[in-house]
Protein backbone atom coordinates (compact mmCIF):
# COMPACT_ATOMS: atom_id res chain seq x y z
CA UNK A 1 0.00 0.00 0.00
CA UNK A 2 1.31 3.42 -0.94
CA UNK A 3 -0.56 5.34 1.75
CA UNK A 4 2.01 4.93 4.54
CA UNK A 5 5.64 5.45 3.54
CA UNK A 6 7.48 4.65 6.77
CA UNK A 7 7.47 5.18 10.55
CA UNK A 8 9.36 8.17 11.92
CA UNK A 9 11.86 7.65 14.73
CA UNK A 10 13.26 10.86 16.20
CA UNK A 11 13.81 12.00 19.78
CA UNK A 12 10.37 13.59 19.85
CA UNK A 13 8.57 10.57 18.38
CA UNK A 14 10.30 8.25 20.84
CA UNK A 15 8.95 10.43 23.69
CA UNK A 16 5.49 10.23 22.11
CA UNK A 17 5.63 6.42 22.23
CA UNK A 18 5.24 6.67 26.02
CA UNK A 19 1.90 8.43 25.43
CA UNK A 20 0.80 5.68 23.02
CA UNK A 21 1.29 7.97 20.00
CA UNK A 22 2.94 6.72 16.80
CA UNK A 23 4.28 8.86 13.96
CA UNK A 24 4.26 7.96 10.27
CA UNK A 25 5.12 9.76 7.05
CA UNK A 26 2.31 9.21 4.58
CA UNK A 27 1.34 10.14 1.04
CA UNK A 28 0.52 13.85 0.81
CA UNK A 29 -2.91 13.11 -0.70
CA UNK A 30 -3.95 10.65 2.03
CA UNK A 31 -6.78 11.69 4.33
CA UNK A 32 -7.24 11.02 8.03
CA UNK A 33 -10.15 8.57 7.52
CA UNK A 34 -8.12 6.58 4.97
CA UNK A 35 -5.12 6.31 7.29
CA UNK A 36 -7.32 5.47 10.30
CA UNK A 37 -9.02 2.65 8.41
CA UNK A 38 -5.72 1.29 7.11
CA UNK A 39 -3.99 1.39 10.54
CA UNK A 40 -6.94 -0.30 12.27
CA UNK A 41 -7.14 -3.07 9.68
CA UNK A 42 -3.42 -3.71 9.22
CA UNK A 43 -2.25 -3.54 12.86
CA UNK A 44 -5.56 -4.69 14.45
CA UNK A 45 -5.71 -1.72 16.85
CA UNK A 46 -8.25 1.01 17.70
CA UNK A 47 -7.33 4.60 16.82
CA UNK A 48 -8.37 7.31 19.28
CA UNK A 49 -7.18 10.38 17.33
CA UNK A 50 -5.07 11.44 14.36
CA UNK A 51 -3.16 14.69 14.02
CA UNK A 52 -1.47 15.65 10.78
CA UNK A 53 0.76 18.35 9.38
CA UNK A 54 2.83 19.00 6.28
CA UNK A 55 6.38 20.09 7.16
CA UNK A 56 7.76 23.03 5.14
CA UNK A 57 9.84 22.38 2.03
CA UNK A 58 13.60 22.57 2.29
CA UNK A 59 15.71 24.01 -0.52
CA UNK A 60 18.05 21.61 -2.27
CA UNK A 61 20.90 22.72 -4.53
CA UNK A 62 22.62 20.57 -7.13
CA UNK A 63 25.17 22.79 -8.84
CA UNK A 64 23.46 25.84 -10.31
CA UNK A 65 19.99 24.28 -10.02
CA UNK A 66 17.88 25.05 -6.96
CA UNK A 67 14.97 22.77 -6.17
CA UNK A 68 12.89 21.63 -3.23
CA UNK A 69 12.73 18.46 -1.20
CA UNK A 70 9.90 15.99 -1.71
CA UNK A 71 6.68 16.93 0.06
CA UNK A 72 5.01 14.52 2.44
CA UNK A 73 2.46 14.55 5.23
CA UNK A 74 3.27 13.48 8.78
CA UNK A 75 0.57 11.79 10.88
CA UNK A 76 0.66 11.37 14.65
CA UNK A 77 -1.69 8.53 15.55
CA UNK A 78 -2.97 8.13 19.11
CA UNK A 79 -4.19 4.66 20.01
CA UNK A 80 -6.78 3.77 22.63
CA UNK A 81 -5.45 2.44 25.92
CA UNK A 82 -4.53 -1.22 25.87
CA UNK A 83 -3.43 -1.21 22.22
CA UNK A 84 0.07 -0.93 20.78
CA UNK A 85 1.78 -1.42 17.45
CA UNK A 86 4.29 -4.29 17.71
CA UNK A 87 6.67 -2.58 15.29
CA UNK A 88 7.55 -0.11 18.06
CA UNK A 89 7.44 -2.39 21.11
CA UNK A 90 10.28 -2.00 23.60
CA UNK A 91 10.45 -5.71 24.44
UniProtKB/Swiss-Prot annotation:
It is found in: Plastid, Chloroplast. InterPro entries: Nucleotide-bd_a/b_plait_sf, Ribosomal_uL23-like, Ribosomal_uL23/eL15/eS24_sf, Ribosomal_uL23_CS. The keyword Flavoprotein does not apply. PANTHER family: 60S RIBOSOMAL PROTEIN L23A (PTHR11620). One of its GO terms (molecular function) is structural constituent of ribosome. Binds to 23S rRNA. SUPFAM superfamilies: Ribosomal proteins S24e, L23 and L15e (SSF54189). Keywords: Chloroplast, Plastid, Ribonucleoprotein, Ribosomal protein, RNA-binding, rRNA-binding. Belongs to the universal ribosomal protein uL23 family. This is Large ribosomal subunit protein uL23c. One of its GO terms (biological process) is translation. The lineage of its organism: Eukaryota, Viridiplantae, Streptophyta, Embryophyta, Bryophyta. Part of the 50S ribosomal subunit. GO terms for cellular component: chloroplast; cytosolic large ribosomal subunit.
Amino acid sequence: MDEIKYPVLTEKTIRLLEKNQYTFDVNKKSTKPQIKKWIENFFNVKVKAINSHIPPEKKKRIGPIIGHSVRYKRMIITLKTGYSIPLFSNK
